[in-house]
């Protein structure tokens, strides 16, 4: 990764991802995270705001002058905040229903960065009984076909995938086998997506199983940390060439305890330029 980025930054590039669950309501913790963790790029999911109302000013005050957004009123929405110039490449509607769940950009060095918010899929893991579950599976299948076309292109795919694939990605594999996000059919679908471009799971590259690794804890828990019933729903996947430049990855569990928290936490990978 060289060229423009190397000329204008340090010798590393830090990219973070966070389902923020309303960017306007949680702008205080967004700016706190940006100030403390100092990512060069932050991808947000579930921004819940139309493009014209997106809060640019506090982000630009911190140096994030390049903002690409694909928003929707009160629901869904994705955004990419960057100190590095970005060119929007695409925004796909993998449900054909107008929901704002994806935006892709290209960095000056040619790296493609794809930010996605996969549907949660409702509560019942049955396509016939729960149309939302079928929509989720179809969304992932369409992503899989799209992913096949990315072979040979340096790409980082990040976001809330709403699937925790491994046993050590959930607090209880046995109890969650029939719970949407960890069912075998979802895990198999995500596996096909990963195989479509030989994606490298950066979280598990640096924190290999069976080590515990979570990015989400329900609001329903009175004490989320004590109960620790977490799941790893958020992911950063890289094409092999990009993964080879990754030097570190971390999740920020302390953010779950901040004032007005999201139920998700940020994750960040650092790359050598």
Annotate each PLM feature:
Residues 1-62, 68, 75-78, 193, ...:
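N-terminal, active-site-proximal structural segment of metallo-dependent hydrolase catalytic domains
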Residues 15-19, 30, 34-52, 113, ...:
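Active-site beta-strand/loop signature of hydrolases that rely on acidic residues for catalysis
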Residues 22-26, 97, 131-142, 182-186, ...:
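Soluble or luminal CAZymes and related metallo-dependent hydrolases
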Residues 29-32, 41, 96-99, 112, ...:
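Glycosyltransferase catalytic domains, chiefly GT-A lineage
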Residues 47-125:
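Structured beta-strand-rich core segments of catalytic domains in phosphoester-bond hydrolases
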Residues 88-93, 166-273:
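Metal-dependent phosphoester-hydrolase catalytic domains
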Residues 119-140, 174-179:
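Surface-exposed cleft-lining segments at the edges of enzyme active sites
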